[in-house]
């Protein structure tokens, strides 16, 4: 929408003197396709239903629906349950609809923190849809590009933390967007990625004490904390695609740490929310497959709660700090 665009998009610019509109994406070249910006009315149920239907009749169009905050998507839960998650299984109708859901614990309270990631993961089976939480611009781009270049259609549920729009570590090189690159279901720690520089040097894989698996914004909180603490015996891995879960790829990544490290899943969400209950069995299978010495996956995150997040900034900050402390405390 033009009305609801945030500062990272500026899809519509308005001249306050004469009230004219300028759409930058319609002024790229003389022979380009038209980019249409529509101010939809504020009914998640109606609008998502329309977009789902549009994705069925126009499969070669990239149809994206973005919630103002992911928390508000539950206003369209009927469409999600009855159509997005199960339409292909029930009626063999394939949809490539993309749902962009701002999700991340940034201190904005219980109505502006959670897209209810756990609900989407609970609906996942039979490869019915994709659930992602991308942490680089390039991976986000390739996830959208893949939607159109595949010869089949699946709904894509994308968590989109707003704080990553201005995070100094959340960047990609220009070549990362090229055809030579692709979508990565798991991303390395910045400290072991040959394309990134300026981070502490980690110990050899045999000396790593903790392997932290996580997804989304919390990775950057942990990365920044580790840089300050100079902890060189803790390595972080990002699960960019939560479903279908990349278990076989994870086997390859975790195998070097099987002899000595302990393995943890870290999330910002309360224990009864987020990805924990969905990914736990997949990760446990991975550890069993690599015959890890410490073969149990453990949880680090908020305690179970009826509310997605606290409404008090001070409590939010203390909870975030507690998660970081647990990750980097000595075993």
Which ranges hold each PLM region?
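Conserved thiamine diphosphate
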Residues: 1-206, 220
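Thiamine diphosphate
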Residues: 91-93, 104-122, 166-331
């Amino acid at each position: 929408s033009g009305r609801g665009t945030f500062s990272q998009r500026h899809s519509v610019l308005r001249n306050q003197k004469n009230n004219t509109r300028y759409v930058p994406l319609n002024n790229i070249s003389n022979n380009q396709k038209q980019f249409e910006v529509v101010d939809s009315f504020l009914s998640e149920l109606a609008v998502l239903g329309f977009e789902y239907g549009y994705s069925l009749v126009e499969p070669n169009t990239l149809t994206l629906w973005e919630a103002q905050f992911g928390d508000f998507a539950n206003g369209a839960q009927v469409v999600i349950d009855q159509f997005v998650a199960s339409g292909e299984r029930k009626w063999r109708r394939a949809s490539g609809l993309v749902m962009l859901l701002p999700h991340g614990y940034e201190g904005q309270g219980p109505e502006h923190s959670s897209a209810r990631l756990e609900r989407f993961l609970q609906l996942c089976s039979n490869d019915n849809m994709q659930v992602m939480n991308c942490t680089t611009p390039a991976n986000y781009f390739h996830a959208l590009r893949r939607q159109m270049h595949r010869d089949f259609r699946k709904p894509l549920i994308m968590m989109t933390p707003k704080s990553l729009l201005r995070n100094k570590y959340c960047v990609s090189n220009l070549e990362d967007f090229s055809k030579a690159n692709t979508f990565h279901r798991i991303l390395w720690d910045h400290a072991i990625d040959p394309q990134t520089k300026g981070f502490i040097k980690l110990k050899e894989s045999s000396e790593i004490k903790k392997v932290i698996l996580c997804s989304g914004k919390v990775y950057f909180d942990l990365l920044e904390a580790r840089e300050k603490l100079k902890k060189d015996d803790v390595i972080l891995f990002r699960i960019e695609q939560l479903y279908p879960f990349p278990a076989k790829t994870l086997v390859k990544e975790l195998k070097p740490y099987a002899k000595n490290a302990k393995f943890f899943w870290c999330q910002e969400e309360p224990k009864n929310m987020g990805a924990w209950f969905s990914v736990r069995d997949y990760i446990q299978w991975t550890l069993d497959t690599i015959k890890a010495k410490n073969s149990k996956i453990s949880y680090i995150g908020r305690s179970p709660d009826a509310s997605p997040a606290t409404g008090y900034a001070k409590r939010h900050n203390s909870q975030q700090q507690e998660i970081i402390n647990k990750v980097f405390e000595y075993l």
